[in-house]
Swiss-Prot record:
GO terms for biological process: heme catabolic process; heme oxidation; photosynthesis; response to oxidative stress. This is Heme oxygenase 1. Its EC number is 1.14.14.18. It comes from Synechocystis sp. (strain ATCC 27184 / PCC 6803 / Kazusa). Catalyzes the opening of the heme ring with the release of iron. Key enzyme in the synthesis of the chromophoric part of the photosynthetic antennae. Gene3D superfamilies: Heme oxygenase-like.
Length: 240
């Protein structure tokens, strides 16, 4: 019997989604204010997070639950490697360092995989649906804000997915068809909210560099008004 997990996740993470949209770094990004050094640090953190998540998902590709949402065409690790080479150069593996919040996120993904792998559903949902929902819009914002012409936005490009909207529907249906009970669904929703919180901590770490670049007065003017969470653009968070 279906527990309509996709709907439960959408409803159960609405507050977290709104909170994520109101982090200063995200609000500035959505308004077209992106500081390159802060952004490349975010790309670095995402590289470590996706590397961990995709490694663990691959381990469980035959899992009775996770096998239903194992879509390697979603994988972002290689795209992030392209972007890191763009921002840091060929020596990027020696240059990129994970932040404290990024490490906490990776540690949680590893812990879940080791103790309750079904909760990886929450991390997959939180990351990939956001990527699919706002990818093209966020790509254009990044290109315009940082004057990018020849790279730096591979993260937002899904070369192996022809129709992103149709794929999102397929993904949601796969979540709804997962062989889980209501108690497990509730644990997945709780984990998704925790994933949102971990994303927000990564964003908060970046605000110092952004403020130094644009000034506190500009930052405050851009972040003063609270968003109502109506947009489906998810900067590294699910569509909500």
């Amino acid at each position: 019997m279906s527990v309509n997990l996709a709907s439960q996740l959408r409803e159960g993470t609405k507050k977290s989604h709104s909170m994520a949209e109101n982090v200063g770094f995200v609000k500035c990004f959505l308004k077209g204010v992106v500081e390159k050094n802060s952004y490349r640090k975010l790309v670095g953190n995402l590289y470590f997070v996706y590397s961990a998540m995709e490694e663990e998902m691959a381990k469980f590709k035959d899992h009775p639950i996770l096998s239903h949402i194992y879509f390697p065409e979603l994988n972002r690790k290689q795209s992030l490697e392209q972007d890191l080479q763009f921002y840091y150069g060929s020596n990027w593996r020696q240059e990129v360092k994970i932040s404290a919040a990024g490490q906490a996120y990776v540690d949680r993904v590893r812990q879940v995989a080791a103790t309750a792998p079904e909760l990886l559903v929450a991390h997959s949902y939180t990351r990939y649906l956001g990527d699919l929902s706002g990818g093209q819009i966020l790509k254009k914002i990044a290109q315009n804000a940082m004057n990018l012409h020849d790279g730096g936005t591979a993260f937002y490009e899904f070369a192996d997915i022809d129709d992103e909207k149709a794929f999102k529907n397929t993904y949601r249906q796969a979540m709804n068809d997962l062989p889980i009970d209501q108690a497990t669904a509730e644990r997945i929703v709780d984990e998704a909210n925790d994933a949102f919180a971990m994303n927000m901590k990564m964003f908060n770490e970046l605000e110092g560099n952004l403020i130094k670049a644009i000034g506190i007065m500009v930052f405050n003017s851009l972040t003063r008004r609270r968003s109502q969470g109506s947009t489906e653009v998810g900067l590294a968070t699910s569509e909500g």
